[in-house]
Every structure is written in structure tokens, then in C-alpha cells.
Amino acid sequence: MHLRSTPQQQRLRSELRSYFAELVPENAYARHAEPARQKEFYRRTVRRLGSDGWLGVGWPTEYGGRGLTPAEQFVFFDEAAQAGVPLPLMALNTVGPTIMQFGTEEQKAYFLPRILSGEIDFAIGYSEPDAGTDLAALRTRAVRDGDTYVVNGQKIWTTNGDTADWVWLAVRTDPDAPPHKGISMLLVPTDDPGYSCTVIRTLAGHDTTASYYENVRVPVSRRVGAENEGWRLITTQLNHERVTLAAHGTMAIRALRDVRDWAARTRLDDGRRVIDLGWVRRRLAAAHVRLEAMRLLNWRMVDALQRSALTPQDASAVKVYGSEARREVYAWLMEVAAAAGPLREGSAGAVLHGELERGYRSAVIFTFGGGNNEIQREIISWIGLGMPRVRR
């Protein structure tokens, strides 16, 4: 594979850099680091992106997108990540494409334009207190009652469950079927009186929620795909999510650049610059190598997408490498920043307005978001390498 940007990709990257610099001024995300302000900043920015026509750059034109190639779509996500632009990744790259493939015409007509405009956002309702890694063990029930389902149950780690407009909800519609059967996908509005959630504060500085469903009535018309065949939709959506999480890992490239610049202008008591220390250069070099390898893997993934040849094991491999590279690079950058690294926003001497510390704490999320990395390794060994499947 020959890696060279086309003139169109170069123009797109240049246009995006100028646009994102105006949309999200330098260090804007750090200035909105308090959770409530983060969420308001996120929704405002997403609506602006939608009104300016920048959401869905890779969506087909028939659904209101720009119809750009996977390579050009990756350029968009790459530049957005490095500029610190928040994106509705679940709605844009997971739920939307799955509705395109499996949804009814009515569902497409209602949801897709609203996703592209930034009007609605989604949370993912998969994991449960007793069904996380083993997702097929989910128990949230949906009982058919005429033209509606009555939903009862609980989900956990429902990111954006307190701010999203809809939940992409996995429910069990046939309790007597085998674990991977009898699951259906429903579109559940969060303004239903039977929906509630509790915010969970995490050490990573990332809010998530536990969400509850008490006699929530969902029209059958809001079921995506056939009844009891939701597992196929879940795996389709998770492949999209794993690819998205890998692309999102390019945020570490910006962190590396910023820490390198900080080390070049910061002097020690003896007058030497931080970057003049041999071990610092080795750490920065190692981080560059890891991120360059991640970039090449991402482009290999994009090439497979363009050829419609992306396999589950390839998606898992890119997700594992990208998420672990991001975590490792942030750890190395924290070493370089030394005592100033752990300082949060607002503290005297905080590196990069506290963004480095926040990025270090949040990096761990990507190792289990979209599927725990240990499970991804099992997918790689079982499907990709033909090794015996792990027994559970």
C-alpha cells in the first residue's frame, strides 16, 4: 500500500484545520473540563458542525452525507481528534450506519437527517451488571404487547445516558432462546417517563451512567431489524465502534507534539532544556514510533474499508493496538513532564492547561470501550488465526 495523500485529501485537511481552529480555539476543551460545561460545550459544538454540513462526511449522498471515501472520512476524524473537536461518534459512526443497513425507510427518514444536523444524540445500552464482557448474557426484557414492547431492566456504563436523546438498546425478546439468539434492538427515547439514569463519576474523569427501564413502552416500528436477530446488528455496530476508537487514538499525536514543544521551551535549574536530556529524547522517540505504527495500521484499515474487505479480526487488531498505544504514550509523556504532569487544570504549573493529566486518566477507557481488549485478542486468535475458541 502506497501512502501519499491525494490533492483532494490535502485540500480537505487544510480546510479542516482552518475550520477547526475557528470552531474550537486552542485549549478550549480544557477550559470546559468541568463535566456539566463539557456536556454543554459538546452539544453546542456538534450542532454547529451539523449546521455547517460537516457531520457525515463519509455518509452516502442519498442519506444527506457528502459521499466521501473512507480515506477522506478518516482525514476528518484525524484532524478533529488532534484539534480537540468533540464528535457524536456513537450516533455518527455506529448507530447511523447500522440504521442505513438494517433500518426501515421510516426509521431512515426520521433518524438519519437528525443525526447529521446534530439535533439528536445516542447512548449505547448494552452492558448490564451481570452482562458486560459476556454481552449475550443480557437480561433486559422486552415483552410484546400488541404493537408495542414493554421494556424492563437495567444497563450500566451507558455513556451519555444523562444527555442523549435516544438509547440504542439491546433487549431480550425470547428468554428461551440460546444466549446469542432471542436478542432484538430497540430505539428508546430518553424522555419516556419510564427511563431514568444515575450518573457514575469515574477515576478517568469521564462521566457514565447506569440506566433504568421501568415499563417503557416502545412501538414495534422502533425495532431495528428482525425480532430475535439483534446479535448481528450488535456485532456490526461494534466493528464500526472499534474502528472509530482506533481513529480516535490519534489524539495522542497532538499530545506528543504539545509535550515535545513544552520540553523544548522549559529549562531546568542548570539552564538545560528538558528536551536536552537523553532519556527524555528516548521517551519522545519511542512515543513517535508507537504512534507512527498506529497511523500506518489505521491507514491499512481505511484501505480495507475502501475495498469492503475489513474483517472482524482486523477491526479488533487495530482497536487493541490503537487503544494500548495511546495509553502507553500518555504514560511516557507523563514521565517527561515529571512532577508537573499530574497537575490538573487550574493548578500552578499544570502542563498544557491540565490536558495531559486528563488524557492520561481517560486513556484507559479505550482499552475496554467497544469490547474489552482481552476479548478482542480472543477474536483475533479464534477467527483470524484459527486457534481453538476459549471456553467459558
What are these regions (language model features)?
Residues H2, V75-F76, T94, W231-H248, ...:
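Glycine-rich phosphate/cofactor-binding loops in nucleotide/flavin-utilizing enzymes
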Residues L3-P7, Y195-M294, F366:
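Glycine-rich beta->alpha junctions and the first turn(s) of the following alpha-helix
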Residues A28-A36, L268-G278, E292-A348:
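C-terminal helix-coil-helix/basic helical segment that borders enzyme active sites and/or dimer interfaces
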Residues R43, G50-G118, N160-W166, L291, ...:
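Internal helix-loop-helix
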Residues G118-Y126, A170:
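A short, Trp-centered hydrophobic/proline-enriched beta-strand micro-motif
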Residues T133-D134, Y149:
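Hydrophobic, small-residue-rich alpha-helical packing segments that form membrane-like cores
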Residues T140-V143:
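A structural signal for short hydrophobic beta-strand segments in well-ordered beta-sheet cores
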Residues D147-T148, N152-T198:
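A short core secondary-structure module
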